Amino acid sequence: MITVSRNHVAASWLGPAVARVRAIPCATPLVLGAIVFALVGSAEPTAAAATGLASTTMLADAPSTPDGAQPRLASDPAQLADDLVADERALRDPSTGEAALMAAAHREQVAYRAIGRHPEWDATTRPRIPPSLLGIYDGNVDARRQLTAMTSVRGTLPAWRVEPPAPADELLSYYHQAESDSGVGWNYLAAINLIETRLGSIDGDSTAGAQGPMQFLPATFAGYGQGGDIHSPHDSIMAAGRYLAANGFASDRDHAIYRYNHANEYVHAVDQYAALIAADPAAFATYYRWDVYCYTTSGDVLLPIGYAATSAIPVADYLATHPQ
């Protein structure tokens, strides 16, 4: 059974004026059985003032924006790059309204996914990015390519539920609490949370049995969770901090991240997203708005908030009733 609804974020904190990690494709897990999903495709918070999440359900047969429909981007790489620049600027403009921020973040995510799969476009797209945005562009494209390299194309969609993540200010408080307790940088915990489950939006076990927002194997969580709940954002983020600290994060950060997931590509992607989240005031707010995608035999498939499947679904069957 599949159910789908569309959910929108309504949080004053998420505006670019605030100072301050799928769609990552569905992935085959490593070590902790990471769900490396494409959200993939974050700023340095101090005291974030966020509201909760407000949802609006849209009928699946709505003619203008069918439920689960992806943003439509230019097919020409040069125009795609120009549109991406416009969206990146809108995401950093304090006057941009929430609806426009959401739309820009969704387009940005899809653009980075497309550019990530087409390195032959680099000679066209990269020169069109202004110097002020080039670091953001390079970091996102590189992270996307690293994650793509470690994931497999799927013929079925996973048995997941896609739900709104915890409120942004709550997640930020958990990352900072874990940093204070473990010494592991808050931005690295956010990057891992982003890559693993799109900040907790994906509710589903990996094929290796990893669970929860930070994708722990139950046996591993038992050693670092201090009796907490593997499905709790707070408890799993705190456990991730302890795990990384115990594996030498302070002296060899990349080794500790590799212990979390045995893939050099994973380590590199975490490093890139963590750097972006720490350096760019708009980054986390933008990533928080990203969707969940799976890279399939039919291309990218958007799994919107409200997607729920109790067993794997052939991609063609899903697309027959949920056009992209």
Question: Can you say where each PLM-predicted feature lies in the sequence?
Answer:
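Sec-dependent N-terminal signal peptides
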Residues: 22-36
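C-terminal region of N-terminal signal peptides and the immediate post-cleavage residues
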Residues: 37-62
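N-terminal export signals and maturation junctions of secreted/periplasmic proteins
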Residues: 61-172
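Intrinsically disordered, low-complexity polar segments
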Residues: 295-324
